[in-house]
Regions:
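Short active-site oxyanion
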Residues: 67-71, 90-92, 189, 248-249, ...
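Active-site phosphate-binding/coordination module
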Residues: 51-160
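Short, acidic loop-to-helix structural element flanking the phosphoryl-transfer center
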Residues: 50-66, 113-120, 172-177, 227-241, ...
Length: 306
């Protein structure tokens, strides 16, 4: 193994991991038992076709039969979750909108919410209303977008991201800014999307001046505004308390900057082979990419011990 990253965490290549027998060991090399697996979706559990591979499905179902909790932790709102996650019976808890809500699928109960404050929503709308960025609002589990942009995507087949995903998961409204203000007590996230990557640094600096807000990103062409304490990590902490599971008993996997805090919260942090370098730099293990069963591989190695 070799040491890298600002925190000096151990990065194990596959051959070194096998050689040194690390599966099942937490930070510090102590033998541990994983009781909860937290998984990002896009770029992690989902492959490029937005499906969950058979190997990963089998690994998750097998882990669940051994009593391990399988948790989705995604930047998507609940209504935008792919069908595949509902076909895996092992998955019970959904952490959505970057941790703004936790839903128990067994009962349909949303037992945790951490939305933006009304004041932050007002400030964000005021800041962004004169810009031409493409805005999305996640409100009570649904995603909303300007009707004019939605119709543009329908008409041209062009979008800042997957066209089919936009048309199937976004709800068009006439005036998104007004809609956000009318629902300012229930806004989970505001996403700012752009086509020119050169805009990102300046836009990020601007958004960082918002009061009581967290700014993160899940793919190159966006920035995401959440509440001051909203994150996948905080939601995972709250779920751990509810289930009586310590952070040392958790494994988390992700690929993007909005996964970093969650990976740092878990006993074993797994970065995808296709993940961004800043994610890989804080991981305990770098697995295969999302098109080569990276999640299934990590679950087999650290949980199933195969």
């Amino acid at each position: 193994f070799h040491i890298s990253g600002a925190r000096g965490r151990l990065h194990y290549e596959k051959s070194a991991a096998d050689q040194h027998g690390i599966p099942g060991c937490g930070k510090g090399g102590r033998e541990m038992s994983i009781k909860l697996i937290a998984l990002d979706l896009d770029g992690t559990t989902l492959n490029s076709a937005k499906r969950i591979s058979e190997r990963t499905c089998v690994a998750l179902e097998t882990a669940a039969k051994q009593g391990v909790h399988i948790v989705v932790a995604t930047g998507r709102p609940f209504a935008a979750l792919p069908e595949d996650v509902f076909h895996i019976h092992a998955i019970r808890y959904m952490l959505t909108s970057n941790g703004a809500a936790i839903t128990d699928l067994s009962s349909g109960e949303i037992f945790y919410e951490n939305c933006l404050s009304a004041g932050t929503v007002e400030a964000a709308v005021e800041m962004l209303k004169s810009t031409d960025y493409i805005l999305e609002g996640f409100i009570a589990g649904k995603a909303y977008i300007e009707k004019a942009y939605y119709e543009y995507v329908e008409r041209t087949g062009k979008s800042f991201r997957d066209v089919r995903y936009i048309l199937e998961t976004r709800n068009p409204v006439e005036n998104l800014n007004g809609f956000l203000l009318n629902h300012k007590d229930h806004v989970e996230n505001i996403n700012v999307n752009f086509e020119d990557l050169a805009c990102k640094p300046g836009l990020r600096d601007m958004l960082l001046t918002l009061p009581d807000a967290t700014i993160t990103t899940s793919f190159p062409n966006n920035l995401e505004i959440g509440g001051s304490t909203t994150s996948k990590a905080e939601a995972l902490r709250q779920l751990g308390k509810k289930l009586g599971i310590r952070r040392e008993e958790m494994l988390a996997a992700g690929d993007s900057p909005n996964d970093i805090a969650m990976l740092q919260e878990a006993g074993i942090a797994v970065a995808m082979g296709n993940g961004e370098e800043e994610v890989k730099s804080i991981a305990d293990y770098i697995t295969s990419d999302n098109d080569h069963d990276g999640v299934g591989e990590a679950v087999e190695k650290f949980v199933l011990k195969v």
